């Protein structure tokens, strides 16, 4: 939990930076009466995403892997982990709308989580993307996805509590 101690190890640098930004905004409010809002979006996806397999996030990486597997004529797709981890995603344009709303309605740097409050397991996400890209069908999905359980799942669960956003925005 970012606000109640040191962040989870794989997210520590990012988490500490978020905590520092919040503290800075709080200090500016106290010292200069500066108005601000502090929005923390969940995992984003959308147009102009990063599809570089070395640095992309899960949705664009899976899309690219499926497309490249089809281009090569591969019979299966290898995916890290077991698929049991869950994530929450937000379309980038919805995030932009949320940021604008926060700027219009808030004047306090109280952290606001911006998300959908809906989780999807990586397994279900892989199945969805494989079907939408045409890599697999409902009938072939189980045979076409191979899970490499020797690779990490990452943090077991990431889903934000968006109740404060609903209340204040």
Feature map (PLM): residue ranges:
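Catalytic helix-loop patch of NAD(P)-dependent Rossmann-fold dehydrogenases
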Residues: 1-45, 49-54
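Conserved active-site helix of classical SDR/Rossmann-fold NAD(P)-dependent CH-OH oxidoreductases
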Residues: 19-26, 59-64, 96-97, 123
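Alpha-helical segments that scaffold the active site and NAD(P)H-binding pocket
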Residues: 25-31, 63-67, 104
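Conserved catalytic/ATP-binding subdomain
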Residues: 53-57, 120
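C-terminal substrate-binding subdomain of Rossmann-fold SDR/epimerase-dehydratase oxidoreductases
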Residues: 68-169
């Amino acid at each position: 939990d970012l606000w109640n101690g040191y962040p989870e190890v794989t997210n520590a640098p990012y988490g500490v930076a978020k905590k520092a930004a919040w503290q800075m905004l709080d200090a500016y409010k106290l010292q200069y009466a500066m108005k601000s809002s502090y929005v923390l979006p969940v995992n984003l996806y959308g147009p102009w995403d990063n599809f570089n397999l070395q640095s992309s996030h899960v949705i664009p990486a899976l899309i690219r892997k499926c497309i490249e597997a089809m281009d090569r004529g591969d019979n299966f797709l290898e995916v890290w982990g077991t698929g049991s981890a869950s994530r929450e995603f937000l379309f980038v344009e919805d995030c932009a709308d949320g940021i604008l709303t926060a700027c219009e309605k808030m004047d306090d740097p109280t952290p606001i989580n911006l998300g959908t409050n809906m989780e999807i397991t990586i397994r279900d996400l892989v199945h969805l993307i494989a079907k939408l890209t045409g890599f697999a069908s409902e009938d072939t999905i189980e045979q076409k996805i191979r899970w490499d359980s020797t690779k990490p799942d990452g943090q077991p669960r990431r889903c934000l509590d968006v109740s404060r956003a609903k209340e204040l925005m």
